[in-house]
Swiss-Prot record:
Coiled coil, from the record: none
Entry EC number(s): 2.1.2.10
The keyword Transferase belongs to this UniProt entry's keyword annotation: yes
Catalytic activity annotation: N(6)-[(R)-S(8)-aminomethyldihydrolipoyl]-L-lysyl-[protein] + (6S)-5,6,7,8-tetrahydrofolate = N(6)-[(R)-dihydrolipoyl]-L-lysyl-[protein] + (6R)-5,10-methylene-5,6,7,8-tetrahydrofolate + NH4(+)
Name of the gene this protein is made from: gcvT
Quaternary structure and interacting proteins, as annotated: The glycine cleavage system is composed of four proteins: P, T, L and H.
Molecular function GO terms recorded: aminomethyltransferase activity; transaminase activity
Job description of the protein: The glycine cleavage system catalyzes the degradation of glycine.
Matching PANTHER family: AMINOMETHYLTRANSFERASE, AMINOMETHYLTRANSFERASE, MITOCHONDRIAL
GO CC term (a single one): cytosol
Name used for this protein in its record: Aminomethyltransferase
One biological process term in Gene Ontology: glycine decarboxylation via glycine cleavage system
InterPro entries, per the entry: GCS_T, GCS_T_bac, GCST_C, GCV_T_N, GcvT/YgfZ/DmdA, GcvT/YgfZ_C, TrmE/GcvT_dom1
Keywords associated with the record: Aminotransferase, Transferase
Amino acid sequence: MELKQTPLHSIHKEMGAKMVPFGGWDMPVQYTGIIQEHLATRANAGIFDVSHMGEIFVTGDANDVLDFLESVTCNTISTMKEGQVQYNAVVNEVGGLVDDITVYKFNDTKYMICSNASNFEAVTQHLLKYVKGNVSIANDSKNWHQIALQGPKADAIFTKYLGKDLSSILYYHFEEMNWRGETIIVSRTGYTGEDGFEIYTSNALGVTLWKELLEIGKDFGLVPVGLGARDTLRLEAKYPLYGHELNAEWTPVESGINFIVKEKSKPYLGYDRIIADKKNGPKSKVVGVRLLEPGVLRENFPIFAADGKEIGKTTSGTHSPSRKESLGLAILQTEFAKNQTEVFVEIRGQKKLAKVETGAFVQGSVRNNR
C-alpha cells in the first residue's frame, strides 16, 4: 500500500529527516537524533508535524449533537464550555476503545474530534454507525494541517510570531484566530507533558507556519522533532498510545485513564462494564514501571511477581533521555499495581528487578498553565 504524505513531506526530506511508515503515512522519525530532540523539547521547544492526525466535525441540532456524543464517549460532554478542549475516548459495545480523542467545543451545535492517524477512519465509521437525530459527521482531515509547538519556550515563540498575548488561552482551551486571511485554531494542548500549542491551519498555511516558526524560534533553541522523540516524551509523561496501552478490548479504567470515565444519566456504549471497572476496580490496569537493573524495557516483555507468578506484560518501554534509566508502561494485575511494588521483567530470558511507579515519570512545564 502506498504511504500517504503530509504537506511537509518534501521539507522533512530536505532537512535530512529519517522517514518511516506510521499509521499509513511516511513520517519523520528523527532529524538530528531522538535524544537531542527530546532534551531540546524539555529544555526549550520542539516543533512536530502532526498533520497525519484526523479532524472530524460533528454538527447539527444542539440537543441531538449532545445526546449523540454522550452516547459514544465515556467523558461528560455536557459540562464543556465554548472554547474548551476535553480528553475523552470513543468507546465500543464491549467497553473497549475505538480511539482516545480530544473534543473541541466551538458552540452547542459544532464540535471537532481529533483522533489518531491510524484510527480516524475507524472512528468516523463508528460514529456514522451510531449517529441519530439531526446530526452530521464530516471527516475533514484532508483539509486541515496540524503542527504541535511544545516546550517551556513554546509560548514565548508563538507569542513573538503572532504578535499577540496568548495567556488568555488556558490549558485544554482553544481560540479561533484570523491569520493571513484565514481562520486558524490555536489550542493549548499537546502530547509531551510540556506547555505548548497544537495549531490547525489549511495545508498551504501549515507549510508557511512550519518554516517561519523554525526561523523565528532559532533564538529560543527550537528544533524539529520526529516521532521517535514524540514517543519518548509521551512515555515520560505517561500518556497512553493506541495499540499499546489502549485497544478495543481493555476498558479506559484498565488502560489507566480512569479519570475520563464518568457516570451519566443515559448509558453509553459499553457502560455497564466500564462503570463496573470504575466502581469495583479492574482485574488489571496500566501503570508505570522502572527498571532497576541494566537493560531496556520494550513492549510485550512478560512481568512476574517475586514468587514467579506471571502477572502482566509491558505495553511500552524506552531508555528515558531525561532520567537516564529505562522506563515503561505495563498492564499488571491490580494487586501488584501499587506504587513501589517490586516486580520482575523478563528480558532476553533473564528476569530483571523493576518497581512500579505511579504518577508521571517526568513533570514538564504543562503544570505551569493549569
